[in-house]
Amino acid sequence: MTNIRKNHPLIKIMNSSFIDLPAPSNISSWWNFGSLLGACLALQIITGLFLAMHYTADTTTAFSSVTHICRDVNYGWVIRYLHANGASMFFLCLFIHVGRGLYYGSFVLSETWNIGIILLFTVMATAFMGYVLPWGQMSFWGATVITNLLSAIPYIGTNLVEWIWGGFSVDKATLTRFFAFHFILPFIITALVMVHLLFLHETGSNNPLGIPSNPDKIPFHPYYTIKDLLGLILLILPLMTLVFFSPDLLGXXXXXXXXNPLSTPPHIKPEWYFLFAYAILRSIPNKLGGVLALIFSILILAIIPLLQTAKQQSMMFRPLSQCLFWILVADLFTLTWIGGQPVEHPFITIGQAASILYFSLILIAMPTVSLMENKMLKW
């Protein structure tokens, strides 16, 4: 068995990636989320495939086909709600995974980090298009509002929006192409994940101390396989609780009524995992400015390696940077809350303050405090 594991052309790749991989001996549970994301992706592809077998991408039948899946297909409701709530778990793991990268300075592995940012954008695009497919009220109006943001691009904006819509409004053509993209993108994501892992295994994992761990490595299996399995069980628990006890808890109520192009819902809002970006978008009164802020709120991750002024890679021994990091987390919670609120007096101001804080923390406060810490530690 040892020979085939180490000599077979295909199995030896798996072996060097998941079995005999030398891993740092001290990586904490924050490193579990990579494998959990892999599990989420597998779940989404499997449940999505079964949903696609019964779904019809047509404006007249899309909504009723989803109803049919929930009512008439064997365990269709389980598959549908696993897929919907699996997306929430996917994003929860994604945000923690990115946060861990920020906290422990994993962004110095620049190729892995940049592929990760591309993955984040791709997953967000996939989730957005998936949200449109059931053709509920919020699906239709969400698609209309978000695609319409492209009209803010000077000169070509309007043509671009009509090109994406495949007409003069969100209609059958839009739904069909969104379904096509929503189906193909997870496979592109899988390919990108392989590239992500390829680059990661070139350098090896970072660790909580942020120091080279070459002298002290342990094999991935059995130590981290069993640890990842525990993480997976702890992820499945809340997911199953959501699916079986309150499957619509994280969804918008308006998505449960069929789309009506003639009546706009009072508050258009995306799923919870986009609310922070949506709040940043809404906090700027100018349309183009809002769109740029929205894109830059995620793209800012790409320039974080350039803003690294600290002599220590990890934040583990930098209490001031830790404080700023947790203020950033609290700020993202605030933005998420504001994104779900109506555009009224106190919320507008809070949203603008939180947006300014978000950018100033990353661009100004964190690099400055890192320099101060260097001085204090006499580095």
From Swiss-Prot:
InterPro entries under this entry? Cyt_b/b6_C (IPR005798), Cyt_b/b6_C_sf (IPR036150), Cyt_b/b6_N (IPR005797), Cytb/b6-like_sf (IPR027387), Cytochrome_b (IPR030689), Cytochrome_b_C_euk/bac (IPR048260), Cytochrome_b_N_euk/bac (IPR048259), Di-haem_cyt_TM (IPR016174)
Transmembrane residue ranges? 33-53, 77-98, 113-133, 178-198, 226-246, 288-308, 320-340, 347-367
Top-level lineage group: Eukaryota
Extract the Pfam families matched here.
Answer: Cytochrom_B_C, Cytochrome_B
Keyword Disulfide bond part of the UniProt annotation: no
Positions bound to heme b b562: H83, H182
**What is the membrane topology listed in the Swiss-Prot or TrEMBL record?**
Multi-pass membrane protein
Task: Please give a single GO biological process term from the UniProt record.
Answer: mitochondrial electron transport, ubiquinol to cytochrome c
Q: What is its main location?
A: mitochondrion
Quote the cofactor binding remark: Binds 2 heme b groups non-covalently.
- Residues holding heme b b566: H97, H196
Describe the task this protein carries out.
Component of the ubiquinol-cytochrome c reductase complex (complex III or cytochrome b-c1 complex) that is part of the mitochondrial respiratory chain. The b-c1 complex mediates electron transfer from ubiquinol to cytochrome c. Contributes to the generation of a proton gradient across the mitochondrial membrane that is then used for ATP synthesis.
Miscellaneous comment: Heme 1 (or BL or b562) is low-potential and absorbs at about 562 nm, and heme 2 (or BH or b566) is high-potential and absorbs at about 566 nm.
Q: Which family does it belong to?
A: Belongs to the cytochrome b family.
Subunit details for this protein? The cytochrome bc1 complex contains 11 subunits: 3 respiratory subunits (MT-CYB, CYC1 and UQCRFS1), 2 core proteins (UQCRC1 and UQCRC2) and 6 low-molecular weight proteins (UQCRH/QCR6, UQCRB/QCR7, UQCRQ/QCR8, UQCR10/QCR9, UQCR11/QCR10 and a cleavage product of UQCRFS1). This cytochrome bc1 complex then forms a dimer.
Protein name, per record:
Cytochrome b
Please name the source species.
Propithecus coquereli (Coquerel's sifaka)
UniProt lineage: Eukaryota, Metazoa, Chordata, Craniata, Vertebrata
Its gene is: MT-CYB
